């Protein structure tokens, strides 16, 4: 495609939005609930998932309901080069994110997890995937007064949650999840829980593990469990919304219209060979596909 055709076809804003969408294709999520050094554990988890994103990284912690975050451009080791950046992230719960890189898209505002401060509490959000109706939803939200601080699709979910009239928070999240379309995995940090959700087709992997001290861990790939000493206990299934808190794990569905169609690129390219996705070892899948 020539430069003339590109400029004639896409406006600068549209092209920027397209670049941001491609970034979410292969990101890495990690979360932990109930560990005294949650940030450091998340650091190691993200390091194990570094292959899923090299543009930027971030960790958001929950310290007795108060959220705090550090993020930056570069590899996990570069973003947290200064030891004090981890030491200042105190708390027993955390979510982290590594972001995939595309040329011309490096922007600190797009680095996750996102942190939101509302009059009725704080929330954190991290996302892996691609929303097929992102542009139409964003236009609709902006026309109704929504203000975005990034050009990432991720922010759309939080605007939808806040605009829902459902009386319960989980009900608002379910409503928002049924509005967005595409392949996605989300981690939401509330003041008293981590919420994990997977799209109705299970396009991206998301698993839950448990540590010897009872801490619960969520990750895009099981290879991250091995690094932190967690044992796999279950995969997040298509259409599931799972709340993790001091009482344990509560599993629910935000839709009954589900069908497991995980992206084949997870086995071919995205995932690490020592990860297990949907019960299948990635290395084994690659060997079998070559026969």
Predicted regions, residues:
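Conserved short alpha-helical segments that host acidic/polar catalytic motifs at enzyme active sites
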Residues: 2-238, 243-291
């Amino acid at each position: 495609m020539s430069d003339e055709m590109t400029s004639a076809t896409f406006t600068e804003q549209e092209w920027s939005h397209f670049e941001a969408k491609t970034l979410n294709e292969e990101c890495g999520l990690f979360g932990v609930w109930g560990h005294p050094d949650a940030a450091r554990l998340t650091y190691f988890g993200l390091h194990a998932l570094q292959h899923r994103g090299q543009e930027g990284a971030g960790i958001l912690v929950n310290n007795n309901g108060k959220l705090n975050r550090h993020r930056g451009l570069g590899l996990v080791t570069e973003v947290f080069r200064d030891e004090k950046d981890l030491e200042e992230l105190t708390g027993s719960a955390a979510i982290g994110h590594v972001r995939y890189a595309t040329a011309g898209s490096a922007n600190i505002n797009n680095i996750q997890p996102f942190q939101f401060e509302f009059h009725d509490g704080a929330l954190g959000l991290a996302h892996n995937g691609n929303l097929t109706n992102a542009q139409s939803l964003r236009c609709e939200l902006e026309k109704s007064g929504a203000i975005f601080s990034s050009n990432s699709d991720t922010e759309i979910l939080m605007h939808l949650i806040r605009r829902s009239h459902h009386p319960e928070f989980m009900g608002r999240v379910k409503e928002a999840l049924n509005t967005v379309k595409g392949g996605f995995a989300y981690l939401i940090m509330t003041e008293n829980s981590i919420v994990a959700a997977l799209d109705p087709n299970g396009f991206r992997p998301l698993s839950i593990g448990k540590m010897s001290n009872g801490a619960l861990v969520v990750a895009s790939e099981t290879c991250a469990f091995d690094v932190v000493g967690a044992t796999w206990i279950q995969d997040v299934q298509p259409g599931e919304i799972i709340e993790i808190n001091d009482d344990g794990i509560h599993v629910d569905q935000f839709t009954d219209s589900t069908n497991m169609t995980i992206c084949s690129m997870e086995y071919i390219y995205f995932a690490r060979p020592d990860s297990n996705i949907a019960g299948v070892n990635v290395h084994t899948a690659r060997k079998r596909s070559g026969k």
